[in-house]
Amino acid sequence: IKLYAKQRRLITLVTDQVYEKEKNNRIMVSILSKIVEFRNGESGLHVEHINKLSGMLLERLVQKTDKYHLTWTDQYLITVASALHDIGKIGIDEKILNKPGKLTPEEFELMKMHTMIGASMLERMEIYKEERLVQIACEICRWHHERYDGSGYPDGLKGEEIPIAAQVVSIVDVYDALTSPRVYKKAYSHEKAMEMILTGECGVFQPLLLDCFCDIQEEVRKVTQEKSEKEGKISGFELTDLKETLKNSHLIGDLKPEKNH
């Protein structure tokens, strides 16, 4: 009986520690991603939208195939890590991030560097770099702009050279970008966004993932509509005030990617 009680206490202790670690992971990821959102002039719901859609797409992918042998833990970590996909934008000039017009070729090349900056930031986290969450986040940061036909950046990866985590987030990120208003464009409708993605206007994605995304498009539409309704309730004053606070803080520095990235 004493042995059983001791085992129960140990199990409870380990469970509590795991829960606390995962909670802390989510808190830190949320803080970092919110900094990027507000600096980039976004509503604050961008990361929440990316999280939800990534989780939904992963769930459908696992239902449809066991090709990637994704466990529940894999799905959870990819979903959490998806929030950090654009963290490298911390190192991009705000004038480029929030430019109301089309970027020049030179500006676009600088913007593309956010993928390498984000990966470099995470790779420098010596204490945590062996953590699976950090490794997945690094993959997503660097490769969420790669395309299945090799036409993406920064490394021109093709097909299954692109980690599945990055492939999932790439579709979700494009959909979110299309259906969200930006300083340089209005939001596209769900229907138009789906058309653009499926016809390859935004690059080539893996056919299986496109099928999965089509399968869940009604759920995606609902989540996106809820996001739009929430955004309508956020005042411009609140967003401007938060951006000014972050601008004056010491959390945003001039980060440069390493030359070999």
Locations of the language-model features?
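Histidine- and acidic-residue-rich, metal-dependent catalytic cores
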Residues: K23-H261
